[in-house]
Amino acid sequence: MDAAVEKIAILDFEASSLSEASWPIEIGLSWLEHGEVRTWSSLIHPAHDWEIDDWSPQSAAVHGISMSELTEAPSATEVAETFFKVLGGRRLVSDAPEFEIRWLDRLLRAAGRAENPSIEDFDGTSFAVFDGYALDLVYETIERRPAPHRAGPDTARLARGWLKASQHQAFLELEGRTA
């Protein structure tokens, strides 16, 4: 198992819409630990200062999360606390960091948190960690699984690509070969 990827968590959000005023409705993290994909996700109860009018029926049709499901969800403060516990110092990556940074910032501000973790690009990180056939395995594994558009399963899908590539690299190391 490549130790570099065990120090990284993949982040994804589902959101009220894709507009500038959008807010996070679900967060997901996946990471590799002891040769397995681990995943945590949570719905997010809308904060009082988030614009409820920004709810998009088109986005809801994609992720399948209803506004009524969010009324019973944990608060932004609870979700942020759990997020940092689960993150445990890992670096963050995402396949859409330009969106995730905005939604992470909204979540943390609503929770009164001052932290502002950076989010690296999934593709750039994949190319930095893997090469050759292992890199091919990352993307072949991802392409074979359609994105479910739910935060936890979406991050798990990407992490499975890294797991497959890491297993290949570990096999080559046992054989005394390189990628």
Over which residues does each language-model region extend?
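Generic secondary-structure boundary signal with a strong preference for alpha-helix termini
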Residues: A76, G112, A165-S166
